[in-house]
């Protein structure tokens, strides 16, 4: 990226913005390789696509890589959604059933995710407008169905008609077909630790869940 020499904004001292004339951004999809290059001092600046769970490793390598790590407040959240237009009509029916989505939300142990992935520094809420929340967002949606409750999640899944019909520990679709959720994600948007814990929570209520970066 090259700075626009005709950019109209200036700072309070009258200096034209932006301060940086040129930026060369390299795309590295693999998170481990991305962190390794940072630890080896192969970048001058990086903010995007860094997850809090990588901070300990980055801190350990700061002296070797001759860099500093600044942990600042951020507005980031992992969001999980279901394909409500799935070609499989039975899956589509289940994914469009609000009771199923409520169950999946209640099955997530957000307190554990906060402790393990965000070191207790996060705040659980639904995926609505971030703080400070605009006035048009009803506060009730912030905490809608976020309290960890496996019993209620199981009850809702029972009501949807999903049951373990063959004793393998996993629920089937109402018509008896097998169901397996496949979470496809990129570490540029969410840490693998968060995805792993969500997948485990869903498996615990009988919804077979796999994940792949």
Language model regions located:
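Extracytoplasmic/periplasmic ligand-capture domains
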Residues: 2-119, 123, 128, 133-213
């Amino acid at each position: 990226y090259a700075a626009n020499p005709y950019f109209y904004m200036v700072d309070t001292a009258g200096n034209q913005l932006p301060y940086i004339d040129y930026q060369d951004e390299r795309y590295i999809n693999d998170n481990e390789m991305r962190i390794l290059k940072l630890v080896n001092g192969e970048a001058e600046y990086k903010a995007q696509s860094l997850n809090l769970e990588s901070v300990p490793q980055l801190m350990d390598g700061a002296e070797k890589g001759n860099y500093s790590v600044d942990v600042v407040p951020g507005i980031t959240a992992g969001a999980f959604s279901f394909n409500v237009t799935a070609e499989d009509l039975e899956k589509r029916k289940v994914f469009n059933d609000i009771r199923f989505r409520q169950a999946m939300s209640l099955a997530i142990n957000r307190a554990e995710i906060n402790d393990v992935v965000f070191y207790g520094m996060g705040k659980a809420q639904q995926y609505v407008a971030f703080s400070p929340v605009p006035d048009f967002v009803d506060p009730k949606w912030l905490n809608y169905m976020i309290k960890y409750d496996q019993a209620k999640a199981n009850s809702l899944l029972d009501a949807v008609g999903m049951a373990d019909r063959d004793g393998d520990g996993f629920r089937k679709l109402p018509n008896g077909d097998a169901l397996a959720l496949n979470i496809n994600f990129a570490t540029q948007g969410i840490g693998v630790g968060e995805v792993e814990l969500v997948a485990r929570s869903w498996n615990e209520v009988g919804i077979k869940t796999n994940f792949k970066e």
